[in-house]
C-alpha cells in the first residue's frame, strides 16, 4: 500500500525580496518541484504549513482518509440497523408467535431508526459545519488585518455536507435493518423464523465487523468475533427482558 508522508514546515511571513528568488519551503523535493503545500495556521511571525507528498514522491497523490471515514461510518450505521431491528424482532418473538407482529415491529424499528440516525447526523454535522465556517471567517479577518488587505484569499477547503451525511446515515441503517426483515419476516413457523433471523444477523455481524476492521487496518477475525458477540448479547438481552416482562404482566 502506498504511504503518504506529511511534514510540518514553519516559514517566515515577512515579505521576501522577490517571488522568483524566494526559496521554496523545506519540504521534500524531486525534479525541481515541491509537494502540495496547505496552510493550516498563521501565527504572529510564521505560517504553519503541511506539505503533502504527491504521486511523484511515492505518496500516490490521493488522500484516502476521508473516503475511509465515510466507509467506516456507513459500516457502523449498517451494523446499528442490523442489531436494532434484529433485537426488536427477537424481543417481539419472545412474547408473540405471530409472524405479522414480528414483521410490523421490524418495519417500525427500521423507519424510526433511520429517521433518528438521519436527524442526529444532520444536527451533528451542521454544528461542525457552522464551527468550521466561523473559524474560516476569523482566520480571514486576522489575515486581512496583518496583511492590510494585500494577502491572497484562503480557499474554502472541504466543508461537510449535513444533507449528504444524513442521507448516508439513514441509507446505511436501512440496508442493515433490511437483512433480518428479509430473512425472517416472511417465515410462518415461529422456530424457523427466529432461527432465520439469528442466522442472517450473525452472518451479517461477522461480515460488518471484518469490513470495519479492514478499513481501519485492524484484525478482521478479532473484530468480527467482537461484533458478533456484542450482537448476540444485545439480542439475548432483548429476548430475556421482554420474556420476563410478558411473564410478569
UniProtKB/Swiss-Prot annotation:
Catalytic activity: Fe(2+)(in) = Fe(2+)(out)
Taxon lineage: Eukaryota, Viridiplantae, Streptophyta, Embryophyta, Tracheophyta
Any one GO cellular component localisation term in the record: membrane
Pfam families xrefs: VIT1
First-listed, main subcellular location of the protein, grouped into a coarse class: membrane
PANTHER family: FE(2+)/MN(2+) TRANSPORTER PCL1
Function: Probable vacuolar iron transporter that may be involved in the regulation of iron distribution throughout the plant.
Region of interest (Disordered), ranges: 1-32
Subcellular location: Vacuole membrane
Positions of transmembrane segments: 75-95, 103-123, 167-187, 194-214, 227-247
Official protein name in the record: Vacuolar iron transporter homolog 3
Membrane topology listed for this record: Multi-pass membrane protein
Highest taxon in the source lineage: Eukaryota
One of the protein's GO biological processes: intracellular manganese ion homeostasis
Topological domain ranges for the Vacuolar compartment: 96-102, 188-193, 248-249
GO MF, one annotated term: iron ion transmembrane transporter activity
Family per record: Belongs to the CCC1 family.
Keyword Signal assigned: no
Cytoplasmic side: 1-74, 124-166, 215-226
Keyword terms of this UniProt record: Ion transport, Iron, Iron transport, Membrane, Transmembrane, Transmembrane helix, Transport, Vacuole
Coiled coil: none
Record-linked InterPro entries: Ccc1_fam (IPR008217)
Amino acid at each position: 500500500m502506498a504511504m503518504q508522508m506529511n511534514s510540518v514546515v514553519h516559514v517566515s511571513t515577512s515579505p521576501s525580496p522577490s517571488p522568483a528568488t524566494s526559496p521554496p519551503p523545506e519540504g521534500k523535493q524531486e525534479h525541481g518541484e515541491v509537494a502540495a503545500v496547505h496552510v493550516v495556521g498563521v501565527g504572529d511571525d510564521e505560517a504553519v504549513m503541511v506539505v503533502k507528498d504527491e504521486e511523484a514522491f511515492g505518496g500516490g497523490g490521493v488522500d484516502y482518509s476521508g473516503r475511509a471515514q465515510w466507509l467506516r461510518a456507513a459500516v457502523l450505521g449498517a451494523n446499528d440497523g442490523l442489531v436494532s431491528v434484529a433485537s426488536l424482532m427477537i424481543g417481539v418473538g419472545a412474547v408473540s408467535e405471530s409472524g405479522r407482529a414480528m414483521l410490523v415491529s421490524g418495519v417500525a424499528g427500521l423507519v424510526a431508526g433511520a429517521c433518528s440516525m438521519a436527524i442526529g447526523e444532520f444536527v451533528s454535522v451542521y454544528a461542525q459545519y457552522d464551527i468550521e465556517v466561523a473559524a474560516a471567517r476569523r482566520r480571514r479577518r486576522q489575515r486581512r488585518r496583518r496583511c492590510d488587505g494585500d494577502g491572497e484569499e484562503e480557499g474554502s477547503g472541504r466543508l461537510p455536507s449535513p444533507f449528504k451525511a444524513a442521507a448516508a446515515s439513514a441509507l446505511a441503517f436501512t440496508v442493515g435493518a433490511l437483512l433480518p426483515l428479509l430473512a425472517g419476516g416472511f417465515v410462518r413457523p415461529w422456530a424457523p423464523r427466529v432461527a432465520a433471523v439469528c442466522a442472517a444477523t450473525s452472518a451479517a455481524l461477522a461480515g460488518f465487523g471484518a469490513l470495519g476492521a479492514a478499513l481501519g487496518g485492524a484484525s478482521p477475525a478479532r473484530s468480527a468475533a467482537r461484533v458478533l458477540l456484542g450482537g448476540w448479547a444485545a439480542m439475548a438481552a432483548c429476548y430475556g427482558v421482554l420474556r420476563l416482562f410478558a411473564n410478569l404482566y
